[in-house]
UniProtKB/Swiss-Prot annotation:
Subunit and partners: Part of the 30S ribosomal subunit.
Any Pfam family: Ribosomal_S27e
UniProt record similarity statement: Belongs to the eukaryotic ribosomal protein eS27 family.
Organism, scientific name: Pyrobaculum arsenaticum (strain DSM 13514 / JCM 11321 / PZ6)
Protein name per UniProt: Small ribosomal subunit protein eS27
């Protein structure tokens, strides 16, 4: 007898990569939505993402959510 397998539900991750625009210089930078370290702008050095233990708190404008 062949073994029947039911549907396997695989949960999708809640974390994504996001593109953030720096409010000071306008530089766009890709970072992780659940960043564990402070993310600074590569051009001017302003803090763009502050870790909170879960999702990061973003100081810049989120331009796009990448998948």
């Amino acid at each position: 007898m062949p073994v029947k397998f039911g549907k396997v539900l695989i949960p999708q991750p809640r974390s994504k990569f996001v593109k953030i625009r720096c409010p000071d210089c306008g530089n766009e930078q890709v970072t992780f939505s659940h960043a564990a370290m402070v993310v600074r702008c590569l051009v001017c050095g302003r803090v763009l993402a502050q870790p909170t233990g879960g999702k990061a708190k973003f100081a810049g404008h989120i331009v796009k959510i990448l998948e």
